[in-house]
């Protein structure tokens, strides 16, 4: 009688397992081939007409864009907010900001405006009206300087045309009113604005001096 050693037993077990695996794969292929010939009851094939294809594409796109939008929202949820709590907080203004108009004076208190009327001529909205008379010393000064702020388009041409930096557009942008008449500025109103913002206006002009 032949005695079986351990290596022989292991080899026999490996051959038996390989044979079983081969039979299983053959059965799987056979089952797949048979299943392909089955007729499934109530199986609805997707319609391939243009309307159905378009509807399916639209639904897919809708959900895709919806998920992308939600993802974008969540990505900004924990970031630093870009908005500020206006009017309690205010953002920085450029030195070139064009806001409410003002007429400036020299440090001596003398009006800068020499009544050349260049600002009146250059204004594309025809919002500026100037009247002037000569003084006893021969210099010309304005007797009337009106700006209709409802016409002004804040182009800054008046400020650029002025040879003595008399008319400027100041840093104030909060000058809403309840009546139309309050937006018709006269010379006194403009000079008061200039006196109020002179330090800031002078600093802005100096900051922008190299680019003028």
Swiss-Prot record:
Its main location: mitochondrion. PROSITE patterns: 4FE4S_FER_1 (PS00198), 4FE4S_FER_2 (PS51379). Residues 104-133, 143-172 form the 4Fe-4S ferredoxin-type domain. InterPro entries: 4Fe4S_Fe-S-bd, 4Fe4S_Fe_S_CS, NADH_quinone_OxRdtase_chainI. Its EC number is 7.1.1.2. Residues 1-36 form a transit peptide. GO terms for molecular function: 4 iron, 4 sulfur cluster binding; metal ion binding; NADH dehydrogenase (ubiquinone) activity. [4Fe-4S] cluster 2 binds at residues 123, 152, 155, 158. Binds 2 [4Fe-4S] clusters per subunit. It is found in: Mitochondrion inner membrane. Core subunit of respiratory chain NADH dehydrogenase (Complex I) which is composed of 45 different subunits. This is a component of the iron-sulfur (IP) fragment of the enzyme. Interacts with RAB5IF. Belongs to the complex I 23 kDa subunit family. This is NADH dehydrogenase [ubiquinone] iron-sulfur protein 8, mitochondrial. It comes from Bos taurus. The lineage of its organism: Eukaryota, Metazoa, Chordata, Craniata, Vertebrata.
């Amino acid at each position: 009688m032949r005695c079986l050693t351990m290596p022989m037993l292991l080899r026999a077990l490996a051959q038996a397992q390989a044979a079983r695996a081969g039979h299983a794969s053959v059965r799987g292929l056979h089952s797949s081939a048979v299943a392909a010939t089955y007729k499934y009851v109530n199986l609805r094939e997707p319609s391939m007409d243009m309307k159905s294809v378009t509807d399916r594409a639209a639904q897919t796109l809708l959900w895709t864009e919806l998920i992308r939008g939600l993802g974008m929202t969540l990505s900004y949820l924990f970031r630093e907010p870009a908005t500020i709590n206006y009017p309690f907080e205010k953002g920085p203004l450029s030195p070139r900001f064009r806001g409410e108009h003002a007429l400036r004076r020299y440090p001596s208190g003398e009006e800068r405006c020499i009544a050349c009327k260049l600002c009146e001529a250059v204004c594309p909205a025809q919002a500026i009206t100037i009247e002037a008379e000569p003084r006893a010393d021969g210099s010309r000064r304005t007797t009337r300087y009106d700006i209709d702020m409802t016409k002004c388009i804040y182009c800054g041409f008046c400020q650029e045309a002025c040879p003595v930096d008399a008319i400027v557009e100041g840093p104030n942008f909060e000058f809403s009113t309840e009546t139309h008449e309050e937006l018709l500025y006269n010379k006194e109103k403009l000079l008061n604005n200039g006196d109020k913002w002179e330090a800031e206006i002078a600093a802005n002009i100096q900051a922008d001096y190299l680019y003028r």
